[in-house]
């Protein structure tokens, strides 16, 4: 299995266009050791030819241009992307769908009922695509017991589980969470049995998650915030990290403590907010992650399982 990180930042990217926090300001001025990052997305393949895209960020065109296998050039119109799996309906994970509207071949999109509802009502991106390329929508089972496959992506099997999280602001059920608003996915390579667990939006470790995470050779999970009060402390938001569906890295029950329980797996943080000190490669927080054997995803990162 080949996992390629197309984008590793949370919504807004890094640096964020209107942000002058120490990280964003320092990156622009060249005074901190850090890498630019686009908004989070990965693609996965078992054969290096047919790729499944997870989420479509607003930066998808740039991300495709920077990863040659997604444009193999076999015909006058071509793509290495054979299917799109949407983890949720958040704007930073779906806006890129509009950038993929060209062509006569329908987009093969895999999403839950809740995500489909959001993307045909509150933010009707799928309705808009029907006026261009069109969409073949495939349902995703979320009970963790029934797997699904993506046509034309041989050698891969996917098992999804519902995660507690908030629906997008434009969702018809914004303040009434439903199973399927957000999912985590166990990705299995049927050729060698290797597995990866992908959950860029993970608010808490629910009882059904350890059984899936224990199977994984690689765990890629929510790296949005370092502390629960990160945005509060900077005066940027009135809510805590967990209030908006993101388990912070530090503190009791934080992501570091969780990942310490899976020492045999490769552990990678993704979907990193621009305020998070782990973006600074020489920060004390990054040193602590390294000491624990936890990696920080970056654009262009390749994971081979």
Curated annotation (Swiss-Prot):
TM region(s), chain numbering: none
Functional summary from the UniProt entry: May be involved in the transport of PQQ or its precursor to the periplasm.
Gene responsible for this protein: pqqB
HAMAP family according to UniProt: PQQ_syn_PqqB
Upper classification of the organism: Bacteria, Pseudomonadati, Pseudomonadota, Betaproteobacteria, Nitrosomonadales
UniProt protein name: Coenzyme PQQ synthesis protein B
Keywords: PQQ biosynthesis, Transport
Family per similarity comment: Belongs to the PqqB family.
UniProt-listed GO biological process terms: pyrroloquinoline quinone biosynthetic process
Annotated pathway: Cofactor biosynthesis; pyrroloquinoline quinone biosynthesis
């Amino acid at each position: 299995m080949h996992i390629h990180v197309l984008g590793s930042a949370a919504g807004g990217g890094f640096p964020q266009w209107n942000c002058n926090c120490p990280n964003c300001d320092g990156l622009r001025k060249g005074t901190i050791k850090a890498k630019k990052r686009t908004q989070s997305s990965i693609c996965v393949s078992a054969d290096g030819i047919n790729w499944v895209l997870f989420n479509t960020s607003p930066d998808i065109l740039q991300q495709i241009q920077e990863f040659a296998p997604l444009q193999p050039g076999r015909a006058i119109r071509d793509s290495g992307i054979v299917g799109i799996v949407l983890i949720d309906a958040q704007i930073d994970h779906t806006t890129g769908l509009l950038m993929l509207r060209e062509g006569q071949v329908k987009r093969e999109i895999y999403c839950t009922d809740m995500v489909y509802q959001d993307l045909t009502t509150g933010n009707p991106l799928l309705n808009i695509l029907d006026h261009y390329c069109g969409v073949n929508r495939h349902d995703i089972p979320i009970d963790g017991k029934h797997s699904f496959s993506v046509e034309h992506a041989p050698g891969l099997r996917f098992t999804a589980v519902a995660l507690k999280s908030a629906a997008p602001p434009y969702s018809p059920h914004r303040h009434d969470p439903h199973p399927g608003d957000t999912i985590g996915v166990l990705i299995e390579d049927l050729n060698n049995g290797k597995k990866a667990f992908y959950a860029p939006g993970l608010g808490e470790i629910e009882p059904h998650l350890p059984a899936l995470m224990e199977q994984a050779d690689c765990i890629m999970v929510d790296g949005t915030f370092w502390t629960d009060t990160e945005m509060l402390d900077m005066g940027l938001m009135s809510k805590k990290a967990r209030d908006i569906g993101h388990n912070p890295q530090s503190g009791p029950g934080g992501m570091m403590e969780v990942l310490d329980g899976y020492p045999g797996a490769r552990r990678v943080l993704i979907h990193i907010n621009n305020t998070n000190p782990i973006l600074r490669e020489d920060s004390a927080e990054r040193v602590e992650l390294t000491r624990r054997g936890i990696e920080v995803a970056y654009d262009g990162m390749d994971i081979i399982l």
